[in-house]
A protein has these predicted regions:
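Repeat-based scaffolding regions
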Residues: 1-193
Length: 193
C-alpha cells in the first residue's frame, strides 16, 4: 500500500464505500500514523470498522471470537460494541459465551441496553439466570429494560404469573411497542382479554 497520504485517504473512502471492513482495519494504522483524521474521526472510524466486522462475523462462534479479540480493549468495554457481539453470539447459538460477556460487562458498568440482551440468553441454568437478574432489582427497581428482561426470563421458565407481573410493571413505566407486544402475546396465550 502506498504511504502517500492522498492515496491512503482515497483507499479509506473506497473501502468504506465497498464495506470492506477487513481491508479498512488493515489501513487504520497508516491513517493514524499519517494523522489523516482527527482523534475523534479516527475513533469513530475505528468503532465503525470493528462494529461492522462483528456484525458481519456471523458464520461461527470461533470466527466471531477471533474478530472480538482484534477489537481494542477500550472498545470492548463499549456497550454498543458488546451488544453487537452478544447479539451475534446469540444468533450463532453460543448462549454461554453471550451470558459470560454480558455478566462481565454488567459487573463493570450497568447498561439497560445490555440488560435487555440478557433477556434473550438461554442459560444452561435458567433458574440461576433468573435469580441473578432478580437480584439486580435491588439497585434498579424501576428500570424498564430490566423488567422486560425479567418478564422474558420468566416466560422461558414458564412462570406465567411472574412474567405477567414483570411485563405489567414494565408497561406502567414505559409503553413501548415491544412491551405491548410481549404483554399482548402473554395475555392471549393465557386466554385473557
Amino acid at each position: 500500500v502506498s504511504r502517500h497520504p492522498y492515496v491512503l485517504s482515497l483507499l479509506s473512502q473506497a473501502y468504506q464505500g465497498l464495506k470492506d471492513w477487513d481491508k479498512l482495519l488493515d489501513l487504520l494504522p497508516q491513517l493514524q500514523k499519517h494523522k489523516l483524521l482527527t482523534v475523534e474521526e479516527f475513533e469513530q472510524l475505528q468503532r465503525q470498522v470493528h462494529r461492522n466486522r462483528i456484525v458481519q462475523g456471523n458464520t461461527e462462534p470461533q470466527h466471531l471470537l477471533a474478530i472480538w479479540h482484534k477489537v481494542p480493549k477500550y472498545l470492548q468495554r463499549d456497550a454498543a460494541m458488546i451488544e453487537a457481539y452478544v447479539h451475534n453470539l446469540i444468533k450463532l447459538g453460543d448462549h454461554d459465551a453471550a451470558e459470560d460477556a454480558l455478566l462481565r460487562a454488567l459487573k463493570q458498568q450497568w447498561s439497560a441496553t445490555l440488560v435487555r440482551q440478557y433477556g434473550y440468553v438461554h442459560s444452561v441454568n435458567a433458574t440461576r439466570q433468573l435469580a441473578r437478574a432478580e437480584s439486580w432489582l435491588i439497585a434498579h427497581p424501576e428500570d424498564p429494560q430490566l423488567l422486560l428482561c425479567l418478564g422474558r426470563l420468566s416466560l422461558h421458565e414458564k412462570l406465567w404469573g411472574k412474567a405477567r407481573d414483570y411485563f405489567e410493571s414494565c408497561y406502567r413505566l414505559q409503553r413501548s411497542p415491544e412491551i405491548c407486544a410481549e404483554l399482548g402475546r402473554l395475555l392471549t396465550a393465557l386466554g385473557e382479554p
